[in-house]
């Protein structure tokens, strides 16, 4: 019984911190700052992407659906909801990634592509 109470307490503490982190990303912005790596040339490019506008990086097309960041008084964090498509001439459009990317943890939800990597740097006002 004592273990069950301890487990319940630990779960409650975890949920309290987790829910606070989710709600702290409260400032919505209109532009995401992204970086892309071309693995063939080893070149890193930094580019801005406005909400719901297509931005090209190599054969990729990146669309930012939402970009949020924490208020200045909290630990810095930015997250963007992205849709990344691969556009190859003469082939159908392929959606490579749809989901949230976090600036502090780019490997948490990474896009898989043999030539390119894309990650979030931050959200701009």
Predicted regions and their residues:
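N- and C-terminal low-complexity/disordered segments
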Residues: 2-7, 11, 20-125
């Amino acid at each position: 019984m004592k273990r069950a109470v301890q487990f319940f307490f630990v779960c409650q503490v975890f949920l309290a911190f987790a829910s606070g982190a989710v709600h702290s990303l409260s400032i919505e912005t209109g532009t995401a700052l992204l970086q892309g790596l071309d693995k063939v040339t080893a070149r890193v490019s930094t580019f801005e992407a406005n909400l719901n506008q297509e931005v090209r990086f190599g054969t990729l097309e990146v669309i930012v659906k939402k970009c949020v960041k924490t208020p200045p008084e909290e630990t810095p964090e930015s997250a963007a909801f992205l849709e990344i498509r691969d556009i190859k001439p003469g082939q159908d459009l392929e959606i490579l990634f749809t989901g949230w990317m976090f600036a502090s943890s780019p490997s948490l939800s990474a896009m898989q592509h043999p030539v390119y990597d894309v990650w979030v740097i931050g959200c701009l006002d």
